[in-house]
Amino acid sequence: MEAIHWPKEFTPGFTDNFVSAETYVAGLTAEEVFPYLTHAHIWHEYYDGASDVKLSGSDEKPELKEGTKFSFNIIGWDVTAEVVEFVEPSKDRPGRLSWHGWVPGDENTRFDALHGFLFENMPDGRVRILTQESEIGKPAAELAKTHSASLLVGFQAWLDGMVDFARKKIRLD
């Protein structure tokens, strides 16, 4: 099975916090689910933890792509982000979308994260969807002590919402 590609500074186990959620779904493909992540303007419709998504330099509702800069609020944090990896899935290749997100601040308040998603077609008509986030900073260390379980539940809800929309073939515009 495939794994998230980690820049060295975000290698899990060496950061202040790490969260991982995963699901396997029969009857869908990576190609069918992936657009529900790349169309970030609809996240709030299937995941209560995300809101106020704004893609830099666009008045329309474009898709996330390599190099896209955007901002959003996730579970109360105003995050600035840039897509650092983007690979559309195909029958023989997993889809990948990762961004570096940060909350500006000083050494006590700055928060950096690498959030990666992987969409992998599996045997027997299944898709594996993995999301992982590796976090750096004092706020991340505090989250690890007090709220890691809530992050896990939130990320699982994000995956479940994506799958639900893909099953229902919800329009993306």
Which ranges hold each PLM region?
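Short structured motifs
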Residues: 6, 18-20, 66-68, 114-116
